[in-house]
């Protein structure tokens, strides 16, 4: 098998090849890439057009109903209206026999709503699935956890970190988008259905608070009500061990729905539990945050993400420096790259303005039709997982001349051979709502890894290009190196994954922090060991 065939085989195994656009548009994956979320605006615009036509039709129908109402009312307001008049008597009987029936069973009303329903059914297949709602809700919980966001603030559209009594504004949107009681209920219910009461309770509490404030108002788009929120919150508190709160909320529920026998039985049950063991069940239980999947480095990872890439103490280290880099290559002599060395062991460098705006845009445009849900290696299988939320596509070097130029620039800057099969095709990634990639290595850590099927060794280096900027979040966190690098538009981040001995460098454990606000795009060029023997020779020291 030739080098090119081996590379193609690897990408087929990874299930991340250039792909099929129709497969890329699978329902249930909208939340996993911001570009897919943006595409969901198109069907909603079509729905708005349908609703506008429906409203216009209903306005005309209501004007006609108002005319009919005023006409009949005027007859009833005149107490002297003589029913002895055969004309009036006839019209009265006609109204009661046919006019009112026509009004109540108006064909116009049914035609208006039928047109709206038919239009909805035509675009329904293009709408996000329930799995997208679940994914978006889990994304809000992820942001809540990693950035220590206050749920009440989020419901008001404010991104605030709360630590004890201190409140820090992480991001101030130009326009506030507040959530409704029904919005908060749906987030809480996703957690509730997973048995995750740590997240369910604050969201359901906010739902109850908002529903209380608007009780009696009817909103046609709402699926839930105050009673629904009280019901779920009461049971969540009970499962969390707080019977006192469960009882209080259940009693409030019965004020609104006194005939609910199930809730009445719950009240009796909670009262009995409190009477039997008041000291045990009155005290508010401490609810542990779930750690699924188990992540040993979670606290370090989240602490680095919370810096949002701002770590000024790094710039006090004398051995770190900035320079104009040519790598003694003629290709870069007339246009050197601005280089910022941000860590030495492992070696990590940031190259500013590595690509232009037009190049970044072109790469995004080339990749967008082929984006598919990102997967991770699990043994010899490739799986979609909750700890990696993004979509990705692979672009062959020959797809566009700009990619050829990009490869020449990477090769000139790194001094490495980036031609297939010594390097993989360019992987372009678009992150989703709260998109992230929890701590991982880029190099293979198992002999059974699909990476070895390229027959070109392990991934010796990573060259990651930021193709966009973000408003907040999305930093690249190096866990054991204890630093995070913010998203810098058009810059490229480079690091060695392997020591010169060929052993993996455990200090390169890194993560993509959740995107708080913004649309994050990156492009990865992974360079393999083979082909670099004389470009990065081995060392007698295993630590080099």
UniProtKB/Swiss-Prot annotation:
GO terms for cellular component: endoplasmic reticulum; endoplasmic reticulum lumen. It catalyses: L-prolyl-[collagen] + 2-oxoglutarate + O2 = trans-4-hydroxy-L-prolyl-[collagen] + succinate + CO2. Keywords: Coiled coil, Dioxygenase, Endoplasmic reticulum, Glycoprotein, Iron, Metal-binding, Oxidoreductase, Signal, TPR repeat, Vitamin C. Glycans are attached at residues 242, 482. Its cofactor is Fe(2+); L-ascorbate. Binds 1 Fe(2+) ion per subunit. It is an enzyme of class 1 (oxidoreductase). GO terms for molecular function: iron ion binding; L-ascorbic acid binding; procollagen-proline 4-dioxygenase activity. Fe cation binds at residues 440, 442, 510. Residues 1-19 form the signal peptide. TPR repeats lie at residues 227-260. Its EC number is 1.14.11.2. N-glycosylation plays no role in the catalytic activity. SMART domains: P4Hc. GO terms for biological process: collagen fibril organization. Highly expressed in placenta, liver and fetal skin. Weakly expressed in fetal epiphyseal cartilage, fetal liver, fibroblast, lung and skeletal muscle. Expressed also in fibrous cap of carotid atherosclerotic lesions. It is found in: Endoplasmic reticulum lumen. Residues 107-131 form a coiled coil. 2-oxoglutarate binds at residue 520. Residues 422-529 form the Fe2OG dioxygenase domain. PROSITE patterns: FE2OG_OXY. Heterotetramer of two alpha-3 chains and two beta chains (the beta chain is the multi-functional PDI). Catalyzes the post-translational formation of 4-hydroxyproline in -Xaa-Pro-Gly- sequences in collagens and other proteins. Belongs to the P4HA family. This is Prolyl 4-hydroxylase subunit alpha-3. The lineage of its organism: Eukaryota, Metazoa, Chordata, Craniata, Vertebrata.
């Amino acid at each position: 098998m030739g080098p090119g065939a081996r590379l193609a085989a690897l990408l087929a195994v990874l299930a991340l090849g250039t792909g099929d656009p129709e497969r890329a548009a699978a329902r249930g994956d909208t939340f996993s890439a911001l570009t897919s979320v943006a595409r969901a605006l198109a069907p909603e615009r079509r729905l708005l057009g349908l609703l506008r036509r429906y409203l216009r039709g209903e306005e005309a129908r209501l004007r006609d109903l108002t005319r009919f109402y005023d006409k009949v009312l005027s007859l009833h307001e005149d107490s002297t209206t003589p029913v002895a008049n055969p004309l009036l008597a006839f019209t009265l009987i006609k109204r009661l026999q046919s006019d009112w029936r026509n009004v109540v069973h108006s064909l116009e009303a049914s035609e208006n709503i039928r047109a709206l329903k038919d239009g909805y059914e035509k675009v329904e297949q293009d709408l996000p699935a329930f799995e997208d709602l679940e994914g978006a809700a889990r994304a809000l919980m992820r942001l809540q956890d990693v950035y220590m966001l206050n749920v009440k603030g989020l419901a008001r559209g404010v991104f605030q970190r709360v630590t004890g009594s201190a409140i820090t504004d992480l991001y101030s949107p130009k326009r506030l988008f507040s959530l409704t009681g029904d919005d908060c209920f749906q987030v809480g219910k996703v957690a509730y259905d997973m048995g995750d009461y740590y997240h369910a309770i604050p969201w359901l509490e906010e739902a109850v608070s908002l529903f209380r404030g608007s009780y009696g108002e009817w909103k046609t788009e709402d699926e839930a009500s105050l009673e629904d929120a009280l019901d779920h919150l009461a049971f969540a508190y009970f499962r969390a061990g707080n019977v006192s709160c469960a009882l209080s909320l259940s009693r409030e529920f019965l004020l609104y729905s006194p005939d609910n026998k199930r809730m009445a039985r719950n009240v009796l049950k909670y009262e009995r539990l409190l009477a039997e063991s008041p000291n045990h069940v009155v005290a508010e239980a401490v609810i542990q945050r779930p750690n699924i999947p188990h992540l040993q480095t979670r606290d370090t990872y989240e602490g680095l993400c919370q810096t949002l890439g701002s770590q000024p103490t790094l710039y006090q280290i004398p051995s770190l420096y900035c320079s104009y880099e040519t790598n003694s290559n003629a290709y870069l002599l007339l246009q050197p790259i601005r280089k910022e060395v941000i860590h030495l062991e492992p070696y990590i460098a940031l190259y500013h303005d590595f690509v232009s705006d037009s190049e970044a845009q072109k790469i995004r445009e080339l990749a967008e039709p082929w984006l598919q849900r990102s997967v991770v290696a699990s043994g010899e299988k490739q799986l979609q997982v909750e700890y990696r939320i993004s979509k990705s596509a692979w672009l062959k070097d020959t797809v566009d001349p700009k990619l050829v130029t990009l490869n020449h620039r990477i090769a000139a800057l790194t001094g490495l051979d980036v031609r297939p099969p010594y390097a993989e095709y360019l992987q372009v990634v678009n992150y989703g709502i709260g998109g992230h990639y929890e701590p991982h290595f880029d190099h293979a850590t198992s002999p059974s890894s699909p990476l070895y099927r390229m027959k070109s060794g392990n991934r010796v280096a990573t060259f990651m290009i930021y193709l966009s900027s973000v408003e907040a979040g999305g930093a690249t966190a190096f866990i054991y190196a204890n630093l995070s690098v913010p998203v810098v538009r058009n810059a490229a981040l480079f690091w060695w994954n392997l020591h010169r001995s060929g052993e993996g460098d455990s200090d390169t454990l890194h993560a993509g922090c959740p995107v708080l606000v913004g649309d994050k795009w990156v492009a990865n060029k992974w360079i393999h060991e083979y082909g670099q023997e004389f470009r990065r020779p081995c060392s007698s020291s295993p630590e080099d």
